[in-house]
């Protein structure tokens, strides 16, 4: 893996529209973590200008997915390139430096990778991270935001319970 992000990314929306929709689905779950983890991780920091710009950009990751994500999923499942799908692809493809995207949601994913169920059921990274966001928002006492995200997760089938990722509290 490269230590720096690429200078350019070329995205063919036709290819994504014809790929298995579960990859877009998991990508949306992972992308929303950019906003929530950046916000919480940088709360008491004075970030450098490039990090500050990344944090500001991360605020644009959750709202569009909550607004257009359900329609984009339907369009991807129908293999149709639409404005909603194109918008979501754009947001999922953005990035923020690793310093602010390694919060609780991603830490939970890392922990879940040792469970046999993660491998056995082929849970995708963003699928597990999306559940971790709910836990992170609960731990941070952001209940209204958690409930908003919970409703969205339910609307497109992203995990809302440990059982959805085949895990148990005793694991």
Each language-model region and where it sits:
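A broad, structure-centric signal for solvent-exposed, well-ordered loop/edge residues
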Residues: 17-18, 95, 165, 169
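Secondary-structure boundary/capping residues
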Residues: 41, 74, 121, 161-162
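Active-site segments that bind and position negatively charged phosphate/pyrophosphate groups
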Residues: 46-152
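Short intrinsically disordered, low-complexity coil segments enriched in acidic
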Residues: 1-8, 99-105, 171
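A glycine/threonine-rich phosphate-anchoring loop and its flanking beta-alpha core
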Residues: 1-54
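C-terminal charged capping/lid subdomain of soluble metabolic enzymes
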Residues: 142-171
